[in-house]
Amino acid sequence: MTGVSVNQFPAAGTVENSPYERLAALGIELPPPPPPIANFVTHVLEGNMLYLSGQGPREADGFLHAGKVGAGGVGVEQAYGHARLTGINLLSVMHEALGDLSRVKRVVKLLGMVNAVPDFEDHPSVINGCSDLLIEVFGPAGEHARSAVGFGSLPGNITVEIEAIVALHG
């Protein structure tokens, strides 16, 4: 659960340089984007900005990981994995919206929400699952501003929900 250093990435023009090559190197295949669960859209493309609605830890078969994070519930390492899966779902929505992840200039901001027990305090370590993935996929362009906060509940009792704002190449 350690952070990812941007120094771990190949120089421009080398193998594993595109987001898709990095995904393949990580053994990640993007699933179909999850459908909205209520009256909203999964993304809004406005000018050179892409706004992504909150996504959760949905497996490709539709299974949603649920539960409270913290003592007596879901552990930090497992919740980190759920945040990473949520990041994969965000990438899937980005791909659907843009047609090509190479259009991403920068991941600007994440809002990570953790369904936590009242005394849980390690929200940042959970949301690192998504942050680390975005840096692995986009390199330095994946570094972002972020909030990681705890909530008393989330839709469907999911463990995490994460939304994103992304800047695009002109």
Give each language-model segment a name.
Residues 2-170:
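Short, polar/acidic, helix-capping and beta-turn segments at strand->helix junctions
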